[in-house]
């Protein structure tokens, strides 16, 4: 399930969907199809916005509405509730409903080899769910409309098409549903088709599709000093995620330097493991949230997004379930990067609070000493209300 639609019509195989991917997002990118069938007078503005944000495809039911579009966007003709037109105009992909039209995409492809064809399936019961599974396994393009709000049928289709080479595009009713569709079964639909309600929706749909966060280059930091600093408030961050043993969140007193704090995944002598929790540090500390923005631990709450990081720098977005702020004894840890930059982290002064070192070594906060090595991250930008910005800012 990894094709990208051809951006322009071609009579040669060299412009097929797979070979045209170089001018589109990579095969791992989520596809965004914008449905302009019912946008009315706002069509021109919405189309321009979609082109500006490089939406992969525009979808219409009239070939005339696909005319004069640039070759940077795929032109999808979705024929639902009407007869298949005799001419497809500039359409590069045509999607039909074999149950209504009495003709299959394969049969149409024999007559029009220059066009890619797909199948539309509306899922309302078990037989149509099986149709969707079959389409996703065999067709180059499957456009799926799930009438019920449950996502279990989509999970079944995704699993059925796991080894398929075609692409599945699921219709979303709004931006909130689009975000959910992209994440079902941790894989999500290959693409989402949505009818915009207003100018701005195309940009937001594209942002949601590209919400994957970049991996980070972690740095080995040498501990230079630790000190017991008395009582203060620290935050335990309980997420809705099961962390890996080599995974945690980045926390630091300054926005330009953070240390990788591990979750309570590793066994403890006096309590069960809590792999969803990171005992993260003093409440003034920064952590890394969505879109490379920093957040104070004190401002996190149910529903907040955080960047989880493993020892190789692989990242994923996780959701906060709750934050517990309590008064505890604190320990300050100062570490230094190879280039001399200093990093500070203030943690609860207790043996069971841990950070990660090279190779996933688990280091208890109370046992850290000068010369020990921990893993950290050194952003280069200063911050303004959490966002990275190039300006002068001295933190100490």
Curated annotation (Swiss-Prot):
Q: How does activity change as temperature rises? A: Optimum temperature is 30 degrees Celsius.
State the similarity comment.
Belongs to the archaeal-type DHQ synthase family. GriH subfamily.
Give the keywords, sorted: Amino-acid biosynthesis, Aromatic amino acid biosynthesis, Lyase, Manganese
Q: What Pfam family is a match for this entry? A: DHQS
Subunit description: Monomer.
GO BP annotation list: amino acid biosynthetic process; aromatic amino acid family biosynthetic process
Q: What is this protein called?
A: 3-amino-4-hydroxybenzoic acid synthase
Q: Per UniProt, what is one GO molecular function of this protein?
A: 3-dehydroquinate synthase activity
What InterPro entries does the database record attribute to this sequence?
DHQ_synth
Q: Report whether Manganese shows up as a keyword of the record.
A: yes
Q: Which gene is the coding source of this polypeptide chain?
A: griH
Instruction: Quote the function comment for this protein.
Output: Catalyzes the cyclization of 2-amino-4,5-dihydroxy-6-one-heptanoic acid-7-phosphate to yield 3-amino-4-hydroxybenzoic acid (3,4-AHBA).
């Amino acid at each position: 399930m990894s094709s990208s639609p051809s951006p322009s019509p071609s009579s040669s195989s060299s412009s097929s969907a797979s070979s045209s991917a170089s001018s589109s997002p990579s095969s791992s990118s989520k596809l965004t199809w914008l449905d302009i069938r019912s946008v009315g007078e706002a069509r021109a503005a919405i189309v321009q916005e979609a082109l500006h944000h490089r939406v992969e495809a525009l979808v219409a039911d009239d070939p005339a509405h696909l005319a004069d579009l640039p070759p940077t966007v795929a032109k999808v003709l979705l024929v639902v509730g009407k007869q298949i037109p005799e001419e497809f105009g500039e359409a590069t992909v045509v999607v039909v409903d074999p149950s209504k039209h009495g003709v299959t995409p394969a049969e149409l492809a024999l007559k029009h080899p220059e066009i890619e064809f797909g199948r539309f399936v509306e899922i309302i019961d078990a037989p149509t769910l099986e149709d969707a599974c079959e389409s996703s396994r065999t067709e180059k393009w499957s456009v799926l409309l799930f009438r019920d709000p449950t996502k279990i049928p989509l999970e079944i289709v995704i699993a059925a098409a796991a080894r398929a080479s075609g692409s599945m595009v699921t219709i979303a009713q709004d931006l909130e549903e689009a975000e959910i569709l992209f994440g079902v079964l941790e894989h999500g639909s290959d693409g989402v088709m949505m009818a915009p309600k207003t100018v701005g929706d195309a940009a937001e749909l594209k942002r949601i599709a590209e919400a994957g966060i970049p991996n980070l280059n972690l740095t080995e930091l040498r501990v230079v000093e630790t000190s017991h600093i008395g009582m203060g408030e620290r935050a335990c961050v309980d997420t809705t995620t099961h962390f890996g043993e080599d995974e945690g969140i980045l926390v630091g007193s300054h926005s330009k330097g953070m240390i990788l704090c591990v979750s309570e995944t590793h066994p403890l002598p006096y309590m069960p493991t809590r792999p969803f929790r990171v005992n993260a540090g003093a409440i003034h500390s920064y952590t890394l949230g969505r879109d490379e923005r920093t957040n104070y631990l004190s401002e996190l709450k149910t529903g907040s997004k955080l960047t989880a990081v493993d020892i190789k720098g692989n990242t994923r977005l996780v959701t906060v379930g709750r934050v517990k702020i309590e008064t505890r004894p604190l320990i300050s840890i100062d570490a230094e990067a190879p280039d001399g930059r200093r990093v500070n982290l203030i943690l609860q002064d207790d043996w069971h609070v841990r950070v990660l070192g090279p190779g996933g070594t688990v280091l208890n906060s109370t046992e850290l000493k000068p010369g020990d090595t921990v893993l950290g991250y050194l952003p280069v930008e200063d911050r303004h209300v959490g966002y990275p910005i190039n300006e002068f800012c001295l933190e100490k």
